From Swiss-Prot:
Keyword flag Transcription regulation: no
Subunit and partners: F-type ATPases have 2 components, CF(1) - the catalytic core - and CF(0) - the membrane proton channel. CF(1) has five subunits: alpha(3), beta(3), gamma(1), delta(1), epsilon(1). CF(0) has three main subunits: a, b and c.
Key words of the record: ATP synthesis, Cell inner membrane, Cell membrane, CF(1), Hydrogen ion transport, Ion transport, Membrane, Transport
Localization (cell): Cell inner membrane
The family this protein is said to belong to: Belongs to the ATPase epsilon chain family.
A Pfam family hit: ATP-synt_DE_N
One GO cellular component, as annotated: proton-transporting ATP synthase complex
Membrane topology of this protein: Peripheral membrane protein
Protein name (Swiss-Prot/TrEMBL): ATP synthase epsilon chain
Amino acid sequence: MAKLHFSLVAPERELFSGEVDMVQAPGAEGDFGVLANHAPFMTTLREGKVTVKDGATTKVFDIQGGFADVGPEGLTILAEHAVEAA
């Protein structure tokens, strides 16, 4: 399976950067998932959870709004505030 490059950035620091299988995020108009080679798009994000899946490993981050940009290089989320969920 092809990998997706994903970066999660908050004003304080970069929380995650790496190659993953899939990312799910809380879009302003509904949740969405991104896999490798996804069509490009940009959207705003609402408060919610970003779930990062890579094989059997899952990481979850709580975010409070922001922007998501899907392009040829992968997915970048610029969050207003983000922390790794406990």
